[in-house]
Structure formats: C-alpha cells, structure tokens
Regions:
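Intrinsically disordered, low-complexity N-terminal regions enriched in serine/proline/glycine
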Residues: 11, 33, 54, 124, ...
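Polar low-complexity intrinsically disordered regions
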Residues: 1-9, 137, 181, 222-225
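N-terminal active-site segment of His-dependent metallophosphoesterases
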Residues: 1-67
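Active-site neighborhood of divalent metal-dependent phosphoester bond hydrolases
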Residues: 45-46, 59-66, 71-202
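Low-complexity, serine/threonine/proline-enriched polar segments
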Residues: 187-227
Length: 227
C-alpha cells in the first residue's frame, strides 16, 4: 500500500546545465521515458521535470533548447528556474540608467570575455530581434528558486540567509522572480542583492591556499577561488 501511494505521488526528474545542447536533452528525456506528442515532450504518469537553469551559451542549439523547455512548461510537464547564464543574459541586454551627457551602457559589461562567454547565444539571435526579446521575456519569468511542499530547487546553492535578504526585493509567493529594480541591484557589485544572487546562482566561493595558487577554468580564465 505504501509503495502504491509513493507511485501515485508527484515525482521529479532534475535536469541542469543544458547549455544549448538540444540533442543531448532529447536523448536524456527519451531515456527517462518521456515521449513526444504534437511537438512537446510529455512526461510519464506522475512525473515532471525541474530544469535547474543554464539553458543557453556554449552549445550549438540555443533556440531548440529554449523551444523544448518552454513547450514542456506550457503544457505542465516541467518547471524551470534561473541559472547564472540567464541572469547574465538579462544583465547583458538590459541598459543601465546613464547620467546626463554620458553614453548608455549595460548592467553587464560588453567586454571581450563577456562576449566570448555569450557568443553562441548572440550568434543564434544576431538577425532575430523578435526572437531575442522573446527569449529575454522568458528569462524574466524564471524564479531564482522553488520552494514546493515536497521539494526545493536552486541552481547552485540553497542559502536561507541570502534568500531572506532577497525576499523583500523579488516577486512574492512560491516563485521568487527578479523584477527590473532587483535585477539592477543584483548587477551592482557590493550590494546585498549582488552577493545573494552570486551565491544562489554560482555557489559559495572560497580562496585557494595562497595568492600564488591559481587554476584555469574550462574557458581559459585564471581563477584564485573555488566553489
């Protein structure tokens, strides 16, 4: 009886960091028992995906991944939260308020390194401004975390203290979404919102043993801290 009860309860398949690899995603869904019907991957009975963010950048199938994820959400077969790459994309494409007489800039600098990290997404939407705005609009709907009756989900680190700091500035309820003001604050180095989002979406960082120690990440960037 207890086994039958468990089988009838909602179960979740947790999928993170797709990074533009639609073929890998569909292969995984197929292995998990999901089937396509009318262009949407549908879940087995009492199952649902929770996507943990980082849908974009790196891989060659940016639009395809977003199409799969959004279709599953719209039909009730998936939930999704924000990753640091979606947060970075919003900041990259959101103009900052400029002082009179100074040039406009963005919440995330358009530096060489930032452009390189975002290159595949930029290329995918280089001649599709409508599609770009639709993608950004989708990112704005993504909560920073889920706190459901039987499961919690966050992209990197579940940190109650930082979540508490963000609660007054994000959309209330069970879905904690950034509005424009909180996006601006979270993109401003040194603010409580900045530090909170860094931890929730990237994880807690600790310095290496000494200043002399460092390593190169997969993007070739020198790092002196680890998560």
């Amino acid at each position: 009886l207890e086994r039958k009860k468990r089988e009838q309860e909602q179960q979740y398949d947790i999928i993170g960091d797709i990074h533009g690899h639609a073929d890998a995603l569909t292969g995984l869904l197929r292995q998990l028992g999901y089937l396509t019907k009318e262009g949407v991957w549908q879940a087995p009975l009492n199952r649902k995906v929770i996507f943990l963010g980082d849908y974009i950048d790196r891989g060659p199938q940016q639009k395809q991944v977003l199409s799969i994820v959004q279709a599953m959400i719209s039909k009730g077969y998936a939930l999704a939260i924000m990753g640091n790459h979606e947060f970075n994309a919003l900041a990259y494409h959101t103009k900052a308020q400029a002082k009179k007489g100074t040039p406009r800039h963005f919440l995330r600098a358009h530096s060489v390194n930032n452009q390189r990290q975002h290159a595949e997404f930029l290329d995918a939407y280089s001649d599709d401004s409508v599609g770009l705005e639709a993608a950004l609009s989708f990112f704005r709907t993504l909560p920073l975390w889920l706190d459901l009756p039987n499961i919690r989900a966050v992209h990197a680190c579940w940190h109650p203290q930082h979540m508490l700091a963000l609660r007054p500035t994000v959309t209330p309820g069970s879905l904690y979404k950034l509005d424009r003001k909180s996006l601006v604050n979270a993109s401003s180095f040194g603010t409580a919102e900045f530090h909170a989002v860094e931890v929730l979406l990237k994880g807690v960082e600790v310095p290496l043993a000494s200043e002399e120690h460092f390593f190169k990440d997969t993007g070739g960037h020198t790092r002196k801290q680890v998560r």
